[in-house]
Amino acid sequence: VVEPGESFTFTFDDETSNNGVFTRSVNAGACTGTFAAPQVEAGRIISYGLHVRCTGTGFLPLSAKIRLQEEHFGFFYETVDETFKSLTEGGYGFVRGEAICGPTTSGHDYRISGEIFAGSHHGFGISREVHLPCNVN
C-alpha cells in the first residue's frame, strides 16, 4: 500500500559488466519525486507537477509520468489528465500538467499519481488530496 505524501523516494542497485563479468553496486542510486500540489491558476487552469531528482548511477534514461486524479464517492479515483516527459537535464527535472477547471457547485478532491522511470528502475507515489472548486471533464 502506497501512503499519500509530499514526496516519495526509492533506491536501487546498478549492474555493470566488465569483460563479461557482471558486478552489482548495492544502493548505487536513489530518486526522489516531490509533488507540486494541484492548484487553480488564472484562466481556470488546474496546474500540477512533479519535481524529480536522482543521484548516484544507473538512473539514465530518466523520465516521469504524472496523472491528475479526481476522487469519486470517497474511494474511487478517475484519471482526468496525464502527462509524460523525458528528463534530459541529467539527474533532475520537472514535469508539469494542466487541465481545464470546469464549473461545479461543490468542487472535487484531487491528487497526483507520479511515476519515475530511472534506467531499468521504477518508483511510484501519490500526493495528498486537495479540494478545488473544479470539475475536470
Question: Positions of the model-derived regions?
Answer:
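Short beta-strand elements
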Residues: 88, 120-137
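Contiguous beta-strand segments within globular domains
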Residues: 39-53
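N-terminal prepro-regions of secreted/extracellular proteins
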Residues: 1-41
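Conserved aromatic beta-strand anchor motif in extracellular beta-sandwich/beta-rich domains
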Residues: 64-72
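Exposed aromatic-hydrophobic patches
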Residues: 90-103
